[in-house]
Amino acid sequence: MWWILLFLEWFVDWARGTFWYLFGRRSGLCKGTISPQGPLVVDQEKKDKVLQKEYASNEVPDNLDVIVIGSGIGGLTAAAVLARLGKKVLVLEQDKQAGGLCKTFTEKGFEFDCGFYYVGQLHENSFLKIALDLITDGQVHFAEQGSHVETVVIGKGPECKEYTIYNGKKQMEAHLKKQFPNDAKAVEEFFKIMKICSEKVRLLCMLKMVPLWFARFILRTGIADFISPILKYSRTSTSEVVKSLTSNQDLLTVFSKTFCGVPPKNSSCMIDALLLHHSKRGVYYPQGGASEIPYHIIQVLEKHGGKVLVNAPVSRVLVNEQQNAYGVAVKTGDEDIEIKASVVVSNAGVFTTFQKLLTPEIQADPQVQEYLKALKPGKGFFQVFAGFNATMEELGISSTDMRLYKGNNVDEMMEEYFASDKQDAPDNVPMMYLSFPSAKDPTSSTRFPGQSRMVIHTLVNPKWFEQWENVNEAERGEEYENYKMRFANHLFDWACVRFPQLKEKVALLHAVTPINMHGLGASYCSMSAEHNLERYQPLNIATIRCNTPVKNLYLSGQDIFTAGYSGALHGGFLCASTVMDRCLHIDLLLQQKKLKSKSVKKLE
């Protein structure tokens, strides 16, 4: 019996020591002050000098500590945080512009964001705002959008139904109850789940920071469930939870409106709850477009001795015989140039990192296979970028986003759609997301007078486009162009049902298929790993972490946490925490507490 007591005493002491080691030490990350916000930079040439700095061997800094592969938000966040903590960091981007899905591009005089729609939780002293200000020095000008965040439209005919989503701590719930008077209790219960998930989501960070054996121990013994019910919602589908509250399919569709490529029956309730909660305190859009975010992160990085270089495709991670990463090889013409650093961070995604940048021998490692088995490639995304020679007032559009569904049985619609024949698919798209970025950006009317822009987003099966996967865009031919425009025209016509004025004012219709993502190095033509229920099983949450079986090689970005801008940012902070071997989220939480205390004193 005595040995059990000794073991328990040792275990308690070990747990205390580990907790202090990971979560008790301060890093100094939040030391110093955020600069006063400067004027918005509208000079594109000035911005391009930061966002499009070409790779050249003489541009590579000496004595690098960290190399980051990929300049998406996850990679830039990790880079900026590590630079602030004294590391010399180089970010390598294979595209011609840094920023990942926060890039902007111009097509026939119309400016578009690649994949940014809005960001929530940026109210004063919020955790996300503090984190974002830290990596941008508070220089991004965000425009708060109206209280009407989104409209969900179910059905395509004259009998379609509309449900509106308004922000507000109490208003969002109250407004939904008005629209679903017979399901007020179900709405109330789902909002309780939202609160639990939003307050306890940091426990997921802890699962990824503590030793893996310990995370598995508290999960398998039920200790983690005793601490918080959030894991119950992470491993349970949205369909199962909502159907236990109501039989109303419309309400299920509204609660799962932002599903990330998977239907409600395969989607984690925790994720859908967090996504709805994300817009509860308002949504924001960067003035000047999404590229403002990487533009200012890069300047913070450069201020601390770092650099971001584009047109620098990494062909492999350099690994020695002891399976320690010590740098990367950059493909320049017919040769590979080796760049060395003590730490390598990959923001290229789990599949690209393990299956393209490492040797087959390392890929076969059981621990690597464990990562790959825990995740599946995400669905393919199809985008339509439309430009109009008319103002938002003339078109009758606003900053409110729209989510349109053919019907309310999303599970069934998705299953039928993805199983459909390639030739039938363009005419049977069951859902789409509609956004007007020009209506969200107050500077748009002065930067691009007389113009408006619309972005349509939907899901497709990458197999429908696989015959053109390895063909240069200029050589894909008429068949490819006609096929993708069948999707684009169908989606645009659907949008015109809602906004008839669009038809006669359209000046540009530009379609982007999943193979554009493949061309940017993404595996399986997807933006991130799939957000299915399997990914959010608690044991898989603990398994998918930033440190890898290859020593000194770390993962960052969406695949580590969740998809989307804030998910990638959290993935970046987790990665920096793992590299520094301390939980930097604690620094942010203490800074949040300090700022809130100051705000209270000002009011007294």
From Swiss-Prot:
Its lineage reads: Eukaryota, Metazoa, Chordata, Craniata, Vertebrata
Residues crossing the lipid bilayer are none
Q: Which residues form the signal peptide?
A: 1-17
Answer yes or no on keyword Plastid: no
Keyword tags: FAD, Flavoprotein, NAD, NADP, Signal
Give the protein name, as stated in the record: Inactive all-trans-retinol 13,14-reductase
The answer to whether UniProt assigns keyword Signal to this entry is: yes
Coiled coil start-end: none
| Gene Ontology MF terms in the entry | oxidoreductase activity
Family indicated by similarity: Belongs to the carotenoid/retinoid oxidoreductase family. CrtISO subfamily.
Q: Which InterPro entries match?
A: Amino_oxidase, FAD/NAD-bd_sf, Retinol_saturase
